Structure formats: C-alpha cells, structure tokens
Amino acid sequence: MKTIQLEKLDVKEGHKVLDLGCGHGRHCHAVYYHKDCQIIGVDLGFKDILIAREGFTAYPDLTGQSKSVFGLGVADALHLPFANNTFDRVICSEVLEHIPDYLYAIDEILRVTKPGGRIGISVPRFWPEKICWFLSADYHNEPGGHIRIFRATELEDDFTS
C-alpha cells in the first residue's frame, strides 16, 4: 500500500527522487515505473534494502525504453550522505514516528531538497495510533517501533518553522 500520492508529489521526467526510509521499496518501485527519473531509496535496514532490490530485478524493463535509474543503500536519516539541494522530490513515508530526534531528520530532509522541491510525508493518523498505545504498553516500547504520535498541525509547523 502506497501512503504517498505520487500525483500530488508531481514527479516529472528527469527528476531526482529520494525515498527516505524506503523499507521494502513500495514507493521506489512506484516512482521508478511511473516516470523516467532517478529514484534513490535509503533505509537503516540492510535486509529491507535487499528486499527492495528484489522488486526491481523481479520486474525489469523489458522494452528497453525506460530512462529510469534506481539506487539503494543503507543510510541514517540524521546523516544523509547527499549534498545540499540534491533532490527534486523527497518521500518520507511512515518514518518520522520512529526517530527520536525527528526535528534533525526534518532538517536533513530540507537540506537535501532543492529549492522549489516537493516533500511527501506520511505518519500514522493520531487517533488510531493513540488507541494502539492505550491498548498495549508494549506497542510503543518495541525496539525501533513508534515512539511518537503526531498531530497533523504539529508536523506542518515543524516543517515550516
């Protein structure tokens, strides 16, 4: 299931796109097969990167017409290995709720996004997440799990301040 609407992100041919916290690559694959562009997926989990790679090799471009290029690697959202103003679009789907210093991750996202670039962010909705936390103390104590619940206005403020 994609949690970022690519139509709203408005990926154009030739764009350079970062999928931060790509996991198994669902958004990487969607962008790669959607537009002729360069998609870079990064995640902390090496096993996740291997699974994401399988998605590209399982469905290769058999026409030979695609100009899309992909790259995958292990990277930390707090220390992205990219120059300033590298990406036209950045996807960060269901990631920020896992990061203790998420404000620094936001700074990194803004740093690598070109002026005028677009950023697609998704986090779990407030009330369903709140209910999960209420029903199970273990839910938010899981290593690497959700450590924060966002309200939409709070997250918007974090990106615009």
Features from the language model and the residues they span:
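S-adenosyl-L-methionine-dependent methyltransferase catalytic module, highlighting the catalytic core
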Residues: 26, 55-59, 78, 100-108, ...
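Conserved N-terminal segment of class I S-adenosyl-L-methionine
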Residues: 1-83, 89-93, 103-106, 145-149
